[in-house]
Amino acid sequence: MLLVLDVGNTNTVLGVFEATPAENGSYTYGRLIAHWRVGTIRTQTVDEYGVLFRNLFAMGNVDFKVIHGIIISSVVPPMDTTLRSVCERYFALKPLFVEPGVKTGMPVHYDNPSEVGADRIVNSVAAFEKYGGPCISVDFGTATTFDVVSAKGEYLGGVIAPGIGISAEALFQRTARLPRVDIKRPTKVMGTNTVNSMQSGFYWGYLGLVDGILERLVEEMGGNVKIVATGGLSPLIGAGSKYIKDVDDLLTLDGLRIIWERNQSNTRKREHGK
């Protein structure tokens, strides 16, 4: 089986894909049999992460011994060494990190391709593979990212905006009397108390940001663009958007699986020390 990890600034998502042996020592991959979302804790040790992984696998009835490959997308460089050690100590495997030099099958037309976060490339690969192009993937994470792929499968660029959670926390931290509130969709725009008014500002204001950016990106692309959203708040925001037609909670995990498949020959060489 294949273990995939998407390490974000706030959360880390793990998934396990079933695998069937194929010719030449490779595998074909099927459904996602288990996945989990945990907090990203930069101070945890290798053994603490090992215990966490064992507990998650036990909950999902997945055996450590059946994992034959690991691929990681990380936007938290200080954790990379720790995660590499976890993989080697607890799985006896060297993980494949999505980084320059890894085959993605997607040309990157960016001023400096190394600046593009691994998660953005992974999302773009999955969006194009699953939905076709041209397409835009929107990921609602700590930051909200919009990534554009051409009809030919080329990464063209995108937009990075503060996430809705950051915006809400900033308002709480910088004001004396406004409370923390849950992010939810109000029944109407006009609030009749402080909490409702804040929730309306967060939801409808952020929805305006999202749809405003998408409107302009679609216009720049000449229209007829597929748009897919992912990330923790994608169902909430996607439900109110005029432009988001598909919400795919597993987009990033599928992207990691696809990139792993495109690097199987390289990973076999690495595992055998060649």
Curated annotation (Swiss-Prot):
Cellular compartment(s): Cytoplasm
Coiled-coil stretches: none
Organism domain of life: Bacteria
Chain residues that bind ATP: 6-13, 142
Pfam families recorded: Pan_kinase (PF03309)
GO molecular function, one term: pantothenate kinase activity
Record pathway: Cofactor biosynthesis; coenzyme A biosynthesis; CoA from (R)-pantothenate: step 1/5
Known catalytic reactions: (R)-pantothenate + ATP = (R)-4'-phosphopantothenate + ADP + H(+)
Active site as annotated: 119
Residues reported to bind K(+): 139
Primary location: cytoplasm
Swiss-Prot/TrEMBL cofactor(s): NH4(+); K(+)
Record bears the keyword ATP-binding: yes
GO cellular component: cytoplasm
Top-level class of the enzyme under EC nomenclature: transferase
Cofactor annotation comment: A monovalent cation. Ammonium or potassium.
Keywords: ATP-binding, Coenzyme A biosynthesis, Cytoplasm, Kinase, Metal-binding, Nucleotide-binding, Potassium, Transferase
InterPro entries hit by this protein: ATPase_NBD, Type_III_PanK
Protein EC: 2.7.1.33
Annotated residues for binding of substrate: 110, 117-120, 194
Cell membrane found in the keyword field: no
Subunit (UniProt): Homodimer.
HAMAP family recorded: Pantothen_kinase_3 (MF_01274)
Family of the protein in this entry: Belongs to the type III pantothenate kinase family.
Role according to the record: Catalyzes the phosphorylation of pantothenate (Pan), the first step in CoA biosynthesis.
Name the UniProt record assigns to this protein: Type III pantothenate kinase
Species this chain originates from: Koribacter versatilis (strain Ellin345)
Phylogenetic classification of the source organism: Bacteria, Pseudomonadati, Acidobacteriota, Terriglobia, Terriglobales
